[in-house]
Amino acid sequence: LEILEIPETQAERWLEAQFPGTDPKELHRAALYGGGNLGRSRSFLEEEAVRRRYGQALSLLSALANGKEFDVVSALAPFEGDKAGFLQLLQDFDGLLGRLAALPYGGTADPELAPIASKISPLRAAAMHDRIDGIRQRLFYNAGCPLTVALFGAQLKEI
């Protein structure tokens, strides 16, 4: 499931067959989250921790879109001592940035990103994406997770 990627519409149909009775909006969210990767989409539906982390990434993006510094700090605070969780947040946040940047160019409509899309341009989303790789490298080579989380928040506010 993790290797095969398919169009999101096909992913939704596959998820509907695997999870009968699931709300179609949740199936759509899972397909968008997975980006055509069935394993990621399935984990979104099966694991509360995955949905919670995705919600935290969405909260971070919303806080940045609205220019609320306290909300940015609040969204990052749970990860100050959680290196693995922060790396997962970065992955989800990066996925949101990619979808956000693609929206004006024919990306899949996403009701959760629609209000944010008018506030964060594709260039700004790309600039945020560029910061993520550097933060991942810092986490890999340095153990200072709280300082790295703070640095990431500061860098995002400058963009």
Which residues does each predicted region cover?
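Charged, glycine-rich active-site and insertion segments that engage polyanionic ligands
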Residues: 1-92, 99, 103-159
